Amino acid sequence: MKTIIALSYIFCLVLGQDFPGNDNSTATLCLGHHAVPNGTLVKTITNDQIEVTNATELVQSSSTGKICNNPHRILDGIDCTLIDALLGDPHCDGFQNETWDLFVERSKAFSNCYPYDVPDYASLRSLVASSGTLEFINEGFTWTGVTQNGGSNACKRGPDSGFFSRLNWLYKSGSTYPVLNVTMPNNDNFDKLYIWGVHHPSTDQEQTSLYVQASGRVTVSTKRSQQTIIPNIGSRPWVRGLSSRISIYWTIVKPGDILVINSNGNLIAPRGYFKMRTGKSSIMRSDAPIGTCISECITPNGSIPNDKPFQNVNKITYGACPKYVKQNTLKLATGMRNVPEKQTRGLFGAIAGFIENGWEGMIDGWYGFRHQNSEGTGQAADLKSTQAAIDQINGKLNRVIEKTNEKFHQIEKEFSEVEGRIQDLEKYVEDTKIDLWSYNAELLVALENQHTIDLTDSEMNKLFEKTRRQLRENAEDMGNGCFKIYHKCDNACIGSIRNGTYDHDVYRDEALNNRFQIKGVELKSGYKDWILWISFAISCFLLCVVLLGFIMWACQKGNIRCNICI
């Protein structure tokens, strides 16, 4: 009986202790921040993986699969290369005088005229591509003593033999081929591009039958340059039934300069000039289809959005494009440090502040208050601190994009086989640039993430310190982001603390009085735990004693018999 009385006393003593919200003369106010059940891991300067409530992917890793035809003017080369369209290959006649922002060459493109080579193919291709036009002006060259408009069965235009429409094949007239000397001044205010060529017969007999002389010569010059080409007579691999070749050359004549052409044979003469323009047109090899859509950035894989600062779709781009990096993902923190809320808050449902964990379910703000008082519990967001954090984070993505997006195109680099060492060097330089940009991108994102997390933590601390300064000695910091308020604080009082109109002096006397009364009888939480554990142990011990006594009594009365066999 004495034991039962003692246990009852202990139980009543435990239940009689003050817990947050149980006493009408006190209240608990906690400050906290938004949290989500599953956050996003980002990298910072000091931490390789830190969880935040929200993050934005910065690397565009996929394309639309098609090249958008807006806002850039796309010219689909179909089965023509740009050089074939430039020369006037019969199957490319549809490209005459075309213009473009981006000329798209296809892998299925082919030549269907006299076999030729361009010693400086990459330079000519790049020059014409950047000009963005095939606008051609015929000029009245006078070729005296020779036959013009030569053709070949390898270059049919319809059923008849033909030739490149922008070139004029000259050969002997009768049995003579006189020395040609023609001049053409540039009296306009723009650069003119002249395309010309030299014919290389496959045999000496072909040479004399076309040009009379056993060896011809072609010299093309301006005030700034001169090119002299001697034909190389000899058989080459057969292409479209021919073992002879044409070498294509080009000359730019500046305003006020003069084009001079001198030849005694083998000349493939120009018919006029291409009007050169300056701009940011380009060329790209791609088999992606042309689609009706809008995109500022184009890659060989297709168009990509440029709303991210980085991309790893393709190194070759045209337009305002994200910077190419090696990383598949770089996440920019756009939310605060995430500390998911603990689902269990103990037997008495105590609330906790930001130092212990975040709060899930705060949909109207990033920072806020929770309270327990005589009127129950409640939660409200602090819009001012929330807006302060959002204002500083907003625009962060745009600032990163402004730092990284290229407002120009990254063209393809091409070199002939004899320029192999230059090509290797160029590849090394490009790879080094990509490595540097990839490192810079990762560092930039890590710095921004560190700043975001420090910023959001700072706003939380500012709000906590602001609340502490209001309450002063009327409340006690509980160490977990909460304050125990030592006076009756109804919902209106809590609201005044939140909006900064709390009057400390009004509650000062009541708070001091309650603090001294409560402190005088308050048991520390450690003693409460010990009392609970001791009372539980004693109860278990008494239960065992009663059960053992009952068994012994039953055995003595004969109601229970125990046999032990050996």
From Swiss-Prot:
Record organism: Influenza A virus (strain A/Memphis/102/1972 H3N2)
Lipidation (S-palmitoyl cysteine): C555, C562, C565
InterPro entries xrefs: Capsid_hemagglutn, Hemagglutn_HA1_a/b_dom_sf, Hemagglutn_influenz_A, Hemagglutn_influenz_A/B
Signal peptide limits: 1-16
Disulphides: C30-C482, C68-C293, C80-C92, C113-C155, C297-C321, C489-C493
Identification of the protein by name: Hemagglutinin
Gene name of this polypeptide: HA
Membrane topology type: Single-pass type I membrane protein
Intracellular or extracellular location(s): Virion membrane; Host apical cell membrane
GO CC annotations, alphabetized: host cell plasma membrane; membrane; viral envelope; virion membrane
Sorted UniProt keywords: Clathrin- and caveolin-independent endocytosis of virus by host, Clathrin-mediated endocytosis of virus by host, Disulfide bond, Fusion of virus membrane with host endosomal membrane, Fusion of virus membrane with host membrane, Glycoprotein, Hemagglutinin, Host cell membrane, Host membrane, Host-virus interaction, Lipoprotein, Membrane, Palmitate, Signal, Transmembrane, Transmembrane helix, Viral attachment to host cell, Viral envelope protein, Viral penetration into host cytoplasm, Virion, Virus endocytosis by host, Virus entry into host cell
